[in-house]
């Protein structure tokens, strides 16, 4: 298998009257992974992570249900396994983007539908990047370190992962807004849970006490928002997938 990457860098020009050039050297990327798999092995929700490049270092913040998945009951419905919206909240902090994207590309590789990751990058200053890093460091302070590998560390956070939030998308946007406050300002216009949630989940949520949020919480909806980018101009776009 080979990995195909497509890239489109959007250049911006400085004002002709600008005397001193202060160029942002750091980068923030929102990584949006598609659903993958089919049938009982389908993972329907997609994934979102934050990738920071600053001072020659890489930080990928990857929050998900990577621990124990917990069954969730909604009236007459009980969702468990891959369809459950709840699980232990695990934060994986990667130090290598190539290692992260290699693992993402493997998701669903043996099924009829593998993962595609869409990356939307923004040039930011080091001080902005550090605001994002500090956001995650504060989460880590009260967490339990559960694994340390060559390319990432795993932390069990005090909060569960839940489909309506906190989840990979809501946490990624909360972190991103530390550096780019206007991110997802008009995100509510792109919320469309019917497009993403499987039928069982839709019925379960309708029978529950939960109301669908009016903020972005599903990766696929976030991807629609970032494609249009009504609030913040995207500087760098990349797509990652396995080439069959």
Where are these regions (language model features)?
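Solvent-exposed, acidic/flexible segments
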Residues: 38, 42-45, 90-94, 122-132, ...
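Glycine-rich catalytic cores of cysteine/serine-nucleophile enzymes that process amide/ester linkages
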Residues: 21-121
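N-terminal low-complexity, Pro/Thr/Ser-rich intrinsically disordered segments
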Residues: 2-24
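Short linear sequence motifs
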Residues: 52, 70, 87-93, 111-115, ...
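Acidic low-complexity segments
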Residues: 100-157
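Low-complexity, intrinsically disordered/propeptide-like segments
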Residues: 4, 31-33, 229
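Activation targets extended, charge/polar-rich intrinsically disordered C-terminal tails
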Residues: 7-14, 134-244
């Amino acid at each position: 298998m080979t990995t195909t990457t497509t890239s489109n860098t959007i250049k911006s020009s400085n004002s002709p009257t600008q005397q001193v050039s202060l160029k942002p050297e750091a980068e923030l990327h929102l990584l949006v992974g598609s659903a993958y798999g089919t049938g009982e092995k389908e993972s329907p929700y997609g994934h979102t992570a934050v990738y920071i490049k600053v001072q020659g270092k890489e930080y990928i913040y990857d929050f998900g249900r990577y621990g124990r998945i917990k069954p969730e009951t909604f009236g007459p419905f009980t969702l468990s396994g891959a369809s459950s919206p709840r699980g232990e909240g695990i934060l994986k902090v990667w130090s290598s983007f190539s290692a992260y994207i290699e693992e993402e590309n493997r998701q669903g590789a043996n099924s009829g539908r593998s993962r595609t990751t869409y990356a939307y990058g923004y040039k930011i200053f080091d001080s902005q990047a550090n605001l994002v890093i500090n956001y995650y460091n504060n989460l880590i302070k009260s967490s339990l370190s559960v694994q340390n590998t060559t390319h990432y560390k795993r932390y069990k956070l005090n909060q569960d992962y839940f489909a309506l939030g906190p989840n990979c998308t809501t946490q990624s946007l909360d972190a991103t807004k530390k550096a780019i406050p206007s991110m997802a300002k008009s995100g509510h216009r792109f919320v469309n849970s019917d497009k993403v949630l499987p039928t069982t989940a839709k019925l379960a949520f309708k029978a529950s006490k939960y109301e669908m949020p009016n903020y972005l919480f599903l990766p696929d909806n976030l991807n629609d928002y970032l494609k249009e980018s009504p609030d913040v101009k995207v500087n760098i776009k990349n797509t990652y997938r396995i080439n069959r």
